[in-house]
Amino acid sequence: MELAVKTLAGDAAGNIDLDDAIFGIDEIRGDILQRTVRWQLARRQAGTHKAKSRSEVNRTTKKSIKQKGSGGARHGSRNAPIFVGGGIAHGPRVRSHAHDLPKKIRKMALAHALSSKAKDSSIMVIDTCELDSPKTKGLIQAFKDLGIENALIISGTEVNENFARAARNIPNIDVLPVAGLNVYDILRRRTLVITKEAAEGIKARFDGAKAEAE
């Protein structure tokens, strides 16, 4: 797949060939993307939710009413879940929400996410993401000229500090290095913007995963 390369100023900077095995998949597997997004979001959950059970509520355990003669039901401890202020039955506990997902599926999902952007013509290649100064105003104008409004920008191995500082105040713009590229962030933004260095890094990342699998 061949795409035109532009500069941040909007000028032409040649063309680049993207690997069809990564960016040119025809049949996008929505089920694989859904599984991977669920896996990512589950890993992000803190899992610190907690409700006290009847054994953890700090109340007296003295029998609340006498066994017989009250005309009501028999009751013992006020810690029981049926009482106001009692423990919670089957309430949330501190736990990890993470679950396993094979590396093969994660690699496949990343390729399908990248291909989905290419298939929708929602991918853009720029030559570099480097700025001389961290000026947000100038970057906003550059994005406007390029038609970038809601985008994930993959800058390369490292993120230029001035570019990162200028971009972090712009809504709906995310900037990540190649190592941070993930399915969820690709899908949540309308456009995927990569640099030439990032394109090489993505190819190397997939080649490394392939070599590891072998």
UniProtKB/Swiss-Prot annotation:
One of its GO terms (cellular component) is ribonucleoprotein complex. The keyword Repressor does not apply. InterPro entries: Ribosomal_uL4 (IPR002136), Ribosomal_uL4-like (IPR013005), Ribosomal_uL4_dom_sf (IPR023574). GO terms for molecular function: rRNA binding; structural constituent of ribosome. Residues 43-83 are annotated as: Disordered. It holds the Pfam family Ribosomal_L4. SUPFAM superfamilies: Ribosomal protein L4. The keyword rRNA-binding applies. Part of the 50S ribosomal subunit. Belongs to the universal ribosomal protein uL4 family. One of the primary rRNA binding proteins, this protein initially binds near the 5'-end of the 23S rRNA. It is important during the early stages of 50S assembly. It makes multiple contacts with different domains of the 23S rRNA in the assembled 50S subunit and ribosome. Forms part of the polypeptide exit tunnel. This is Large ribosomal subunit protein uL4. It comes from Hyphomonas neptunium (strain ATCC 15444).
